[in-house]
Amino acid sequence: MTNLFTRHTRRSLTALALLSGGVYAADEVNAKILSRSLRVFVTGGQVLWDYRIHFKGIERDHPDYHSKLQSLNQRIAHRLLYLCFENGGIYTKFGQQLATFNHGLPREYTMTLAQLQDQAKPVSFDKVKQTIEAEMGRPWNECYKEFDQTPIASASLAQVHHAVDALGREMAVKVQYPHLELQMKADIRVIKWAFQFTEYCFPDVQLQWLFPEFQKALLAEVHFDAQCTALLIIF
């Protein structure tokens, strides 16, 4: 019976692995959404565990409470920095906006997350080519005589490349990151859940007031790019 159960279990796990691999290969966008969401959940679990261990047996009136809180905030801030940078896109924008809330967040967060203002993770040139070709309706090298593969600037939602078009005009081309609007809906839901989870675990921490401001700014920027630039801005 045990051997039979083991064989069935092994076959089930193998089938599940093959199915998961097929889904991942067939739907790269959803796979990336899943991986980013899992990174959020893992980070949330790390923060909760760190808090419970760090403050075990320590009350607010303890003489070391304030210093321990500062060190905990710093560790959490570094975890958020890593999370936003690795997830990129909307998460980078989220971290950048958190860094501006000097009036509502501890200094450890605003100072650490401010690094995202100058550090955005660029996408590969293959993705850039796909975006250009989808927008222009023809191969990218028919649109440009020269196109620098390394971006001259990378922002949270787009990056800029130096190029020379077919007429010999030098220009900067702004390329919005691929699948941004598709990913945005899922990412926003996960970020909202993270706010709710934080307030549930830490009733004294009020964060949900930040979410409407973040969502409003994000939608305005994404829609501006989509309506006014159609993924490409030529300066």
Curated annotation (Swiss-Prot):
| GO CC annotations on file | extracellular region; host cell cytoplasm; host cell nucleus
Q: Which residues form the signal peptide?
A: 1-25
Where is this gene product found?
Answer: Secreted; Host cytoplasm; Host nucleus
Q: Name one Pfam family in it.
A: ABC1
- Cross-referenced InterPro entries: ABC1_dom, Kinase-like_dom_sf, Mito_struct-func_regulator
Induction record: Expression is up-regulated at the earlier infection stages.
Q: What is its main location?
A: secreted
Domain of life the protein comes from: Eukaryota
Keywords in alphabetical order, please. Host cytoplasm, Host nucleus, Secreted, Signal, Virulence
Per the Swiss-Prot or TrEMBL annotation, the motif RxLR-dEER is positioned at: 36-60
Per the record's keyword annotation, is Transmembrane included, yes or no?
Answer: no
Q: What does this chain do?
A: Effector that acts as a broad suppressor of cell death to interrupt plant immunity. Inhibits cell death induced by cell death-inducing proteins, including the PAMP elicitor INF1 from P.infestans.
Give the family from UniProt: Belongs to the RxLR effector family.
Anything noted about its domains? The RxLR-dEER motif acts to carry the protein into the host cell cytoplasm through binding to cell surface phosphatidylinositol-3-phosphate.
The protein depicted here goes by the name: Secreted RxLR effector protein 27
Gene name, Swiss-Prot/TrEMBL: RxLR27
